[in-house]
Amino acid sequence: MDLRIFFISLTCVSALIGPGVLWGAEEGEPVVSEITITAHNSELRFDTEKFTVKAGQKVKLTLVNPADSINLQPHNLLIIEPGTLAEIGTAANAELADPSFLSDRHAVPTSNYVIHHTKLLLPGESETLEFVAPTFAGDYPFLCSYPGHWSVMHGIMVVEN
């Protein structure tokens, strides 16, 4: 068999049966979903409004806060329980009176509804969260909880079965 035909066939088979099967993932081993979200450098928004993961899937989520002369804002990213966006955002605005809220707590409000969060990132910083997606399907909001940002700087992590 011609070597080119062999590699083309191997590529086609790999595409049909799915990622990880021919290239090292053990059967039953979950595939890691890698997502990068960047804070928009001139507006209060993320470049990603929605992403989808499987329930119980391993996730590597990277938040990038780019550095340039336009972006001087710190940002973070919280993943929270469905239906709690306004509650968490309002709590973040209210907790600004606490001097430790920005410095020690990275603008993360005290709440059991916060599932995962990054630290507060200055321009030019990034952070990667590694976690297992919730086991229950649903729309899990993510937001920047720096005071005043949450109402426009949010999106949805869709968890599917």
Q: What are these model-derived regions, one by one?
A:
Residues 73-81:
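Short Gly/aromatic-enriched secondary-structure transition segments
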Residues 30-58:
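N-terminal edge beta-strand
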Residues 57-65:
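Short beta-strand elements of extracellular/lumenal beta-sandwich folds
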Residues 8-18:
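Bacterial N-terminal signal peptides
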Residues 43-47, 70-73, 86-88:
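Short, solvent-exposed loop/turn elements at domain surfaces
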Residues 1-9:
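Bacterial N-terminal signal peptides that target proteins for export
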Residues 64, 69, 105, 112-161:
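Extracellular/periplasmic metallocenter environments
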Residues 23-40, 80-105, 132, 147-161:
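Extracytoplasmic/periplasmic copper-protein system
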